[in-house]
Amino acid sequence: LDFFLGGAKYQRSRIYLGSKAGEFFLKQTPDFDKDKDFEDVDAALFDFDGDGDKDLYIVSGGSDNMELDKYLTDRIYINNGKGEFNLSGQKLPDVDHKISTGTASFEDIDKDGDLDIFVGERLKINNYGLPSSGFMLVNDGKGNFSNQTQKLSPELNEIGMITDSEFSDIDNDG
C-alpha cells in the first residue's frame, strides 16, 4: 500500500511507498520538485495510458493566481510501473480559460472502454463566491481529451463552487 500527499504552493508533492513490513518510505520524484510552485488541491490515481498501473492526476488551484496563470493547469504524471512518476506531455484542454480546479473524477462516461474526466471548478479567480462550472472531458481512446460538457451536461455551467466529485450508479440503471 502506498500513498500520495499533495503540496501547497511552493511545497513539493510527495509519494510514500509502503513495504511489506508496514513502513512507508519517501520516493524521490524529480518532476514534483520542478512543479512545486503549483498548489495541489486534489489528486486521483487512474490508469491514464492503459498499461495496467495507476498514473496520477493532480488538480491545481488556489485563489492567488491570475486567470491565465500556468499554475492553474492540472497535471498528469505517468507511472513507469515501478512507482516512478514523470510529468506527461499530454495537454488537457483549457475548458474555456484556466480554472482553479477543486476536484477531478474518472469514469468511462461514453462507454467506449477508456476513462473520461469530470473536472470541477472550485472558485472563480478574483471573483470568489460566484458560481463555478463543471466540465466533462471525453477521451478519444488515444489519451486526447475534448470538452464535451455542452453536449453531455450543459447544466454543469455555473452550477456552484465544486469541492468534491465521485461517479456512482445511484439509480442502478447501468
Predicted regions and their residues:
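Beta-propeller blade termini
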Residues: 1, 17, 39-50, 92-93, ...
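Hydrophobic beta-strand segments that make up the repeating blades of beta-propeller
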Residues: 2-7, 56-60, 117-121, 165
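Blade-edge motifs of beta-propeller repeat domains
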Residues: 3, 17-38, 77-99, 137-160
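Flexible loop residues that form catalytic
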Residues: 8, 48, 61-62, 109, ...
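Short, solvent-exposed loop/turn segments at conserved positions within beta-propeller repeat blades
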Residues: 8-11, 66-72, 126-132
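Hydrophobic beta-strand positions in blades of beta-propellers and related beta-sheet-rich domains
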Residues: 13-15, 56, 74-76, 134-136
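A generic tandem-repeat structural signature
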Residues: 25, 29-81, 85-87
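Surface loops at the rim/top face of extracytoplasmic beta-rich domains
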Residues: 97, 111, 120-135
